[in-house]
Amino acid sequence: MTPGTPRNSSDQSLASSVERYLQDKGKGRGGDGGNYRRNAARELERFVEWAAADRGADDWTGIVPDDVDREPTFDDLDERVFREYARHLSGDRGLKQNTVQTYYRYISAWCGWCVNEGYLEAHYAQRASAMAPLPEDDGRKPGDQQAWTSEQRHALTRHVDERARDAVEAYTTLPEDTDPLDKQRARYAALKAARDRALVFVLAYTAVRVGELLRDPNDPRRRGVRWEDISLDDGSMDVYRKKQQWDAASLPDPVISPLRSYRQLMDPPTERWPVFPTFDQRTLAELVQDELADRGERPEAITECREEYARDLLLALDEEIRPPSITTDGARSILQRLSETAEIDIDHPKHDYLAPHGGRRGMGEVLVRAFGYTVAARYLDNSEEMVRERYSHIEAGELGNVATEALNEIDSIPADDTDRN
């Protein structure tokens, strides 16, 4: 069947096509993972409910003619339906402008897929009349997104470096007769501070996307960077890129030392150990108990074993029980905590802390200013066109300086000339 060739669309429910679409677009084995699939599934489910009059204003009766008692089918879809849904998104739910645009794009992408699959004869959702009720662009400029400034980057990295140094020194200088549990508590504090330092330095200087670095619960392929993925000698790190393939990212000099000292302190039992494991006590307690039970340990023995450790993370290290990596949400929580303790001055309308993506954007600004768009695009793993678009505020400012310099050099009015008038 060629694209645009109609199926027997009257026999096809919208919901069944949505499931097929999500399988095609999903990531991971069986098409059951990925943020896109999750977000699209939510919005397409809302669209199907709206089409059947199960969602919407009280006087909304759905897209099926009033004299017919059945579920909506593709025969009921045309550009007027998508226009009405665009109006519903724009006015009935109080969504922000860019959110309305995003939600409509999920519906439009499904509509395009339906054309290719032969469910629909035309891409009704992309017609001008259908999109007319959508709000205009919210006017957000490329430079409006948070980017760590040099002062913020230095303040945060200096803060986490001092914390890690103090914690490691406190642990390594303990007297030999220190109580074993107290020594474990000191080691745990040193490990946590060293992990936080390594995470901040990686986010600040590598420009790697936080989603490429840490675990995404909705995408089984994004399990977080492991020690086997890192070569400190070569200064490289293998990450699963946004473009859905493995690629090497650079580790610049400022990142090497924090990672090396952190690894020495942790001494991971295997190379498959996550570089940034979770320190969440509830998660680790459940993991340790389940793993030891699977190994045949009795509940009483598990309890006794756990009582010998100040923290379950230390037990996991000794017993080679691999914890999960922290998630992207976990990284945000860490940076919120560190931004507060570092007392960093932050003036941004959306974030009152140094958000993970701001580290990448801050490094992007450094690279664009120092080496231009081509080099920055390679380091950021983006197209040069996209980098130019996202950092266009830099070029605009520099062109303004060039224009000012040109006016001063060529078009300035000599003081003598003004005196003659």
Segments from the language model and where they lie:
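C-terminal secondary-structure termini that scaffold catalytic or DNA-interacting sites
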Residues: 132, 405-421
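Catalytic-site neighborhood detector that most strongly recognizes the C-terminal catalytic loop/helix
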Residues: 380-405
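Flexible interdomain linker/hinge and immediately adjacent N-terminus
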Residues: 4, 65-68, 120-178, 394
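N-terminal core-binding DNA-recognition domain of tyrosine recombinases/integrases
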Residues: 19-35, 42-144, 186-188
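Short, basic (Lys/Arg/His-rich) helix/loop patches that form interaction surfaces
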Residues: 298-378, 385
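Alpha-helix N-cap/helix-start motif at helix boundaries, enriched for small hydrophobics
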Residues: 107, 199-200, 207-216, 222, ...
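Basic, Lys/Arg- and aromatic-enriched nucleic-acid-binding interface segment
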Residues: 155-210, 270
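Conserved tyrosine-mediated DNA breakage-rejoining catalytic core shared by Y-recombinases
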Residues: 215-309
